[in-house]
Protein backbone atom coordinates (compact mmCIF):
# COMPACT_ATOMS: atom_id res chain seq x y z
CA UNK A 1 0.00 0.00 0.00
CA UNK A 2 1.34 3.36 -0.98
CA UNK A 3 2.07 6.11 1.48
CA UNK A 4 -0.73 8.62 1.63
CA UNK A 5 -3.48 6.11 0.93
CA UNK A 6 -4.97 6.44 4.42
CA UNK A 7 -6.21 10.04 4.03
CA UNK A 8 -7.57 9.19 0.59
CA UNK A 9 -9.47 6.18 1.95
CA UNK A 10 -10.86 8.28 4.80
CA UNK A 11 -12.10 10.82 2.25
CA UNK A 12 -13.72 8.13 0.07
CA UNK A 13 -15.39 6.49 3.09
CA UNK A 14 -16.59 9.93 4.17
CA UNK A 15 -18.45 10.17 0.87
CA UNK A 16 -20.28 6.93 1.71
CA UNK A 17 -18.52 4.60 -0.71
CA UNK A 18 -17.55 1.02 0.01
CA UNK A 19 -13.88 0.17 -0.42
CA UNK A 20 -12.37 -3.03 -1.75
CA UNK A 21 -8.65 -3.32 -1.13
CA UNK A 22 -6.41 -5.42 -3.37
CA UNK A 23 -3.07 -6.24 -1.77
CA UNK A 24 -0.02 -8.42 -2.16
CA UNK A 25 0.34 -8.55 1.63
CA UNK A 26 3.75 -6.85 1.79
CA UNK A 27 2.64 -4.27 4.35
CA UNK A 28 0.67 -6.07 7.07
CA UNK A 29 0.80 -3.14 9.49
CA UNK A 30 -0.86 -0.87 6.91
CA UNK A 31 -3.41 -3.57 6.12
CA UNK A 32 -4.23 -3.93 9.81
CA UNK A 33 -4.52 -0.17 10.24
CA UNK A 34 -6.98 0.43 7.40
CA UNK A 35 -9.13 -2.55 8.39
CA UNK A 36 -9.10 -1.72 12.11
CA UNK A 37 -10.10 1.88 11.29
CA UNK A 38 -13.10 0.53 9.36
CA UNK A 39 -11.88 1.91 6.04
CA UNK A 40 -12.01 -1.36 4.09
CA UNK A 41 -15.16 -3.35 3.39
CA UNK A 42 -13.59 -6.22 1.45
CA UNK A 43 -10.00 -7.35 0.92
CA UNK A 44 -8.50 -9.48 -1.83
CA UNK A 45 -4.95 -10.71 -1.35
CA UNK A 46 -2.73 -12.23 -4.01
CA UNK A 47 -0.79 -15.25 -2.83
CA UNK A 48 1.75 -15.70 -5.59
CA UNK A 49 3.34 -19.04 -4.72
CA UNK A 50 4.92 -21.21 -2.05
CA UNK A 51 7.64 -19.76 0.13
CA UNK A 52 10.28 -21.50 -2.00
CA UNK A 53 8.88 -20.19 -5.29
CA UNK A 54 7.74 -16.73 -4.23
CA UNK A 55 10.81 -14.67 -5.17
CA UNK A 56 11.08 -16.23 -8.62
CA UNK A 57 7.37 -15.72 -9.24
CA UNK A 58 7.49 -12.03 -8.37
CA UNK A 59 10.79 -11.53 -10.19
CA UNK A 60 12.78 -10.29 -7.21
CA UNK A 61 15.83 -11.68 -5.42
CA UNK A 62 13.83 -11.95 -2.18
CA UNK A 63 10.18 -12.04 -1.17
CA UNK A 64 8.82 -10.46 2.04
CA UNK A 65 7.59 -13.83 3.31
CA UNK A 66 7.24 -12.84 6.97
CA UNK A 67 5.05 -9.89 6.04
CA UNK A 68 2.97 -11.95 3.61
CA UNK A 69 2.33 -14.62 6.24
CA UNK A 70 1.38 -11.94 8.76
CA UNK A 71 -1.14 -10.47 6.30
CA UNK A 72 -2.57 -13.93 5.62
CA UNK A 73 -2.98 -14.59 9.36
CA UNK A 74 -4.61 -11.22 9.92
CA UNK A 75 -7.14 -11.65 7.11
CA UNK A 76 -7.96 -15.16 8.32
CA UNK A 77 -9.18 -13.60 11.57
CA UNK A 78 -12.23 -12.59 9.51
CA UNK A 79 -12.70 -9.01 10.65
CA UNK A 80 -14.04 -8.20 7.17
CA UNK A 81 -15.02 -10.35 4.17
CA UNK A 82 -11.92 -11.31 2.19
CA UNK A 83 -10.53 -13.66 -0.42
CA UNK A 84 -7.17 -15.07 -1.33
CA UNK A 85 -6.30 -15.61 -4.96
CA UNK A 86 -3.49 -17.09 -6.97
CA UNK A 87 -2.81 -16.49 -10.63
CA UNK A 88 -1.68 -19.89 -11.86
CA UNK A 89 1.27 -19.90 -14.26
CA UNK A 90 2.32 -23.17 -15.88
CA UNK A 91 6.01 -22.37 -15.42
CA UNK A 92 5.64 -21.56 -11.70
CA UNK A 93 2.96 -23.82 -10.23
CA UNK A 94 2.88 -27.59 -9.81
CA UNK A 95 0.41 -29.85 -8.00
CA UNK A 96 2.74 -29.87 -5.01
CA UNK A 97 2.88 -26.07 -4.99
CA UNK A 98 -0.90 -25.82 -5.04
CA UNK A 99 -1.14 -28.34 -2.19
CA UNK A 100 1.37 -26.35 -0.12
CA UNK A 101 -0.36 -23.01 -0.72
CA UNK A 102 -3.77 -24.53 0.06
CA UNK A 103 -2.46 -26.01 3.31
CA UNK A 104 -1.09 -22.60 4.33
CA UNK A 105 -4.46 -20.98 3.55
CA UNK A 106 -6.43 -23.69 5.35
CA UNK A 107 -9.01 -22.13 7.65
CA UNK A 108 -9.56 -19.17 5.34
CA UNK A 109 -12.94 -18.44 3.77
CA UNK A 110 -12.16 -18.87 0.06
CA UNK A 111 -9.29 -19.19 -2.39
CA UNK A 112 -9.67 -18.31 -6.05
CA UNK A 113 -7.41 -19.83 -8.67
CA UNK A 114 -7.26 -17.87 -11.90
CA UNK A 115 -5.27 -18.82 -14.99
CA UNK A 116 -2.49 -16.51 -16.12
CA UNK A 117 -3.38 -14.28 -19.06
CA UNK A 118 -0.56 -12.96 -21.18
CA UNK A 119 -0.75 -9.34 -22.27
CA UNK A 120 1.64 -6.85 -23.88
CA UNK A 121 2.19 -5.10 -20.53
CA UNK A 122 3.31 -8.32 -18.77
CA UNK A 123 7.04 -7.69 -18.25
CA UNK A 124 8.07 -11.33 -18.33
CA UNK A 125 7.78 -13.10 -21.67
CA UNK A 126 7.32 -16.82 -22.26
CA UNK A 127 4.81 -17.52 -19.50
CA UNK A 128 1.72 -19.65 -20.11
CA UNK A 129 -1.61 -20.49 -18.54
CA UNK A 130 -2.20 -24.08 -17.52
CA UNK A 131 -4.81 -25.99 -19.50
CA UNK A 132 -8.35 -26.35 -18.17
CA UNK A 133 -7.78 -29.92 -16.99
CA UNK A 134 -4.81 -28.81 -14.90
CA UNK A 135 -6.83 -25.94 -13.43
CA UNK A 136 -9.57 -28.39 -12.45
CA UNK A 137 -7.00 -30.74 -10.91
CA UNK A 138 -5.53 -27.83 -8.95
CA UNK A 139 -9.02 -26.86 -7.80
CA UNK A 140 -9.61 -30.39 -6.51
CA UNK A 141 -6.31 -30.34 -4.64
CA UNK A 142 -7.14 -26.97 -3.10
CA UNK A 143 -10.61 -28.10 -2.04
CA UNK A 144 -9.04 -30.67 0.30
CA UNK A 145 -7.90 -27.75 2.46
CA UNK A 146 -10.03 -24.70 1.67
CA UNK A 147 -13.01 -23.78 -0.50
CA UNK A 148 -11.29 -23.34 -3.86
CA UNK A 149 -13.00 -21.76 -6.84
CA UNK A 150 -11.66 -21.61 -10.38
CA UNK A 151 -12.13 -18.12 -11.76
CA UNK A 152 -11.79 -17.87 -15.54
In which residue ranges do the predicted regions lie?
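A structural motif corresponding to the C-terminal end of an alpha-helix
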Residues: 71-82, 138-150
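Glycine-rich phosphate/pyrophosphate-binding loop and the adjoining helix
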Residues: 121-144, 149
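Conserved AdoMet/S-adenosylmethionine-binding subsite of the radical SAM
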Residues: 1-128
Amino acid sequence: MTDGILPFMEQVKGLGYLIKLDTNGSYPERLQTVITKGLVDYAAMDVKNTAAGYAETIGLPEAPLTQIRESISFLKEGRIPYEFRTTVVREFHSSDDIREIAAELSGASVWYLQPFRDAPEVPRKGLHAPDQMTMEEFGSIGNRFIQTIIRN
